[in-house]
Amino acid sequence: MSFIINILSTPAILVGLISLFGLILQKKPVEDVVKGTVKTIVGFLVLTAGSSFLQTGPLNDFGVIFNYAFNMQGVVPNNEAIVSLGLADFASDTAYIMCIGMIANIVLARFSRLHYIFLTGHHTLYMSAMLAIILNVGNLTGPMLWISGGLILGLIMVISPALCQPTMEKITGTDELGFGHFGGFGYWFSAQIGKLFKDKSKSTEDVNFPQRISFLRDTTVAIGLTMTIFFVVVTFVAVVVRDGMSDPTISAFFKGETQTHWIVWAITKGLSFAGGVYIILSGVRLIIGEIVPAFRGIAEKIVPNAKPAIDCPVVFPYAPNAVLMGFLVSFLGGIVGLFVLGGINKALIPVALILPGVIPHFFCGATAGVFANAEGGLKGCLVGSFLHGLLITFLPAICMPVMGSLNFANCTFSDADFSITGIILGNIAQFVKGGGLFAVCVVLFLLPIIYNVIMPKKKEA
């Protein structure tokens, strides 16, 4: 079982197998099968390497130095942290839910009108862990827990891409690609905000730079310079303003950097950030070039009209300027949201202070920027990303009492779909227990299939 879970939770291998299967179904020559499979796996490994480099390097370091510079105390939403705690007690339940959920995803894609195959393995694992934790509180154990969790997981794996699909088609210019990332509600929300500015704002990618700064149209250069400025300013506040320049190196914050002057460190980290984004974009281009053609084989043979739903960086190459703007403005929204929560805490009721985590605001905020830009251009991008930053600050705060009641105090999920699922299902599980909760999960899963059977389909013109 552990071997199977390792495969299903490793996106590169999972998507490589999907590509292999699709190419074989199309009866492609052996050389094409090998080439397509290997390039798909390599593409995901490149994407993962870029994401990991950002998360463990520049993004993590920026979060540490930012929190110290501005003396912030609170909860930083982090999917990996809370999942690691959950797996300590619910590892087997998580594994079974994940396997059943992926089967349920295929069933819904085949027999409902939500033709999406969710391929973001690590998010599937995270959602499985959360469902295992919450449903356990609803007095479900063993097979009833696994089936209930698997059915809800399969349902979320088609609903989230379906929410994003109308805007996804505008971003990519094709209906062959879905979007698979459990921040879907947040991206849909940003897109709806963007629509308020439709036909009133030019795209972020149409921003005209003066000739002397035309180099900013190069994504790598623009991101590198912007993040270098951010790192220099924040590190200056931490080292010079707060510590009084007692030590010009960065050793007080990062022990391995004992000989590095803070200015050199800040510049290096800012440019490293741009390098990580460049790696991600390179991986995305490799994946898209191979997975979409290969997936047609599966769509034609098993799930007609199925779309592969792929992780959020898949949209980054379509609007690089929106990626940077979305991240920065979403992060600003997170800071504003923190002060709003602080005000609520003092004036009304005690509520968790949610610190703006750099990782969710980069990946989710950047994606929200791309979605909002597709619907409302530059103005839509700025407003949609800012409100998205507020959203992923307030939702985890609302979800905190649920997680606290499950003995996961001081931890919460970061992305919108996790928070919404936790809030809704967590509250249901507090009141509906055992067989009743199992029945609720089964009915929810069957609704898209029932709708497909009883409701007339639109006739093609």
Where are these regions (language model features)?
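Hydrophobic alpha-helical segments embedded in the membrane of multi-pass proteins
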Residues: 95-104, 122-133, 150-155, 331, ...
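Helix-loop-helix module between adjacent transmembrane segments
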Residues: 87-99, 115, 321-324
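Signature of multi-pass transmembrane helix bundles
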Residues: 1-51, 96, 100, 104-298, ...
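Membrane-helix interface and helix-disruption motif detector
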Residues: 82-90, 116-117, 138-146, 216, ...
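Membrane-proximal extracellular juxtamembrane segment immediately upstream
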Residues: 51-55, 349-352, 372, 381, ...
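Helix-loop-helix junctions within the multi-pass membrane cores of secondary transporters/permeases
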Residues: 16-21, 34, 59, 63-84, ...
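Juxtamembrane "helix exit" motif at the C-terminal ends of alpha-helical transmembrane segments
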Residues: 227-246, 334-349, 365, 395
